[in-house]
Swiss-Prot record:
Name recorded for this polypeptide: Adenylyl-sulfate kinase
Gene: cysC
Coiled coil regions, renumbered to chain: none
Function (record text): Catalyzes the synthesis of activated sulfate.
Active site: S108
SUPFAM superfamilies recorded: P-loop containing nucleoside triphosphate hydrolases
Top-rank EC class of the record's enzyme: transferase
Organism from which the protein derives: Staphylococcus carnosus (strain TM300)
Gene Ontology biological-process annotations: hydrogen sulfide biosynthetic process; sulfate assimilation
Cysteine pairings via disulfide bonds: none
Pfam families the UniProt entry points to: APS_kinase
Ribonucleoprotein listed as a keyword: no
Length: 199
């Protein structure tokens, strides 16, 4: 629900197409989704570096980082998770309008919320990247010791354990992080971007 009234959208004199032309690549949002520990942040960090080294203008939005500032007033209830993704979707749209390739690393457990972000972007701009890994594999990795805390009863409503995760039905990219290395995942995504003539 929009609460703001008496507001006007101010158009820029620089178009998205002009920005893309200047940058030498198209703008897309690479939306990494998957369980905690599935590799979203690890792969997006490596991909951001690889794109930077190729001269591609990109920016990474990470779930934990965003909750330190923009979304520090949100918890992990279903309503707060929904608002978290709504805000990130709007920020991603702004970065896309700026002509950047945006990398987002968010569990984003609800399909409906990811679909909403797809809808607010232009056709072809939302690229869903499913970092596929089983709960068992993620729990074995447990880079933040979150699964350990869940099992000890210290964390409730944890995605994949006692809160749902709705896996993508038809993502543009599936990265099986149980079978592929970070380097292989980065190569796979860059190949997709080249094949789609984004870069």
């Amino acid at each position: 629900m929009v609460k703001s009234q008496n507001i006007t959208w101010h158009d820029s004199e620089v178009t998205k197409n002009e920005r893309q032309e200047k940058n030498g690549h198209k703008s897309v949002v690479l939306w990494f989704t998957g369980l905690s520990g599935s590799g979203k942040s690890t792969i997006s960090v490596a991909l951001e570096k690889a794109l930077f080294e190729r001269g591609v203008r990109s920016y990474r939005l990470d779930g934990d980082n965003i909750r330190h500032g923009l979304n520090n007033n949100l918890g992990f209830s279903p309503e707060d998770r929904k608002e978290n993704i709504r805000r990130i979707g709007e920020v991603s749209k702004l970065l896309s309008d700026a002509g950047l390739i945006t990398l987002t690393a968010f569990i984003s457990p609800y399909r409906e919320d990811r679909d909403h972000v797809r809808e607010i972007l232009e056709d072809g701009e939302f690229v869903e990247v499913y970092t596929k890994a089983s709960v068992a594999a993620c729990e074995e990795r447990d880079p933040k010791q979150l699964y350990k805390k869940v099992r000890a009863g210290e964390i409730k409503n944890f995605t994949g354990i006692d809160a749902p995760y709705e896996a993508p039905e038809d993502p543009e990219i599936i990265v099986d992080t149980e079978e592929n290395s970070v380097e292989e995942a980065v190569e796979q995504i860059i190949q997709y971007l080249e094949d789609q003539k984004v870069i």
